[in-house]
From Swiss-Prot:
Biological process, per Gene Ontology: ERAD pathway
CDD domains: LCL2-like
Free-text function comment from the UniProt entry: Probable component of the endoplasmic reticulum-associated degradation (ERAD) pathway.
Signal peptide (UniProt feature, chain positions): 1-17
Keywords: Signal
Protein name per UniProt: Long chronological lifespan protein 2
Family the UniProt entry places it in: Belongs to the LCL2 family.
InterPro entries assigned: LCL2 (IPR034543)
Highest taxon of source: Eukaryota
């Protein structure tokens, strides 16, 4: 009888500890939302971005990644120019690729090799 009671107590304490762990890991529901609006992490919905995008004044093209107003889409700047190189394709489009520690111009060379199927 004592053994059964001790096993039951052990089971309950272990289960409670697990639930507390998961509650702490995943923010505990409402408590997480409150802390994010008080200067914590940014909420995971896209309302801020959509409101900013819809409220931006641009008579030409509004870049979706940076919200910069440019004449044509391939003139959009990279969101993180310190770590990204911009590569413009001949057909009026562009991409930003991670510099990845390569020497200057290496990213563009690798992109060209990939476009030709050589990489």
């Amino acid at each position: 009888m004592l053994r059964t009671a001790l096993l039951g107590l052990l089971f309950i304490t272990t289960a409670k500890a697990q639930f507390q762990f998961f509650e702490q890991m995943f923010g505990g529901g409402q408590q997480h939302q409150e802390s994010s609006s008080q200067g914590g992490n940014v909420p995971s919905d896209s309302a801020w971005y959509q409101n900013t995008y819809n409220g931006a004044q641009c008579s030409n093209y509004l870049c979706p990644g940076t919200l910069a107003c440019v004449a044509v889409p391939h003139h959009c700047p990279c969101a993180h120019p310190q770590v990204e190189d911009k590569f413009e394709f001949g057909e009026g489009s562009a991409i930003c690729a991670s510099k990845g520690g390569f020497k200057a111009g290496e990213t563009a060379r690798k992109i060209e090799l990939a476009r030709k199927g050589l990489l």
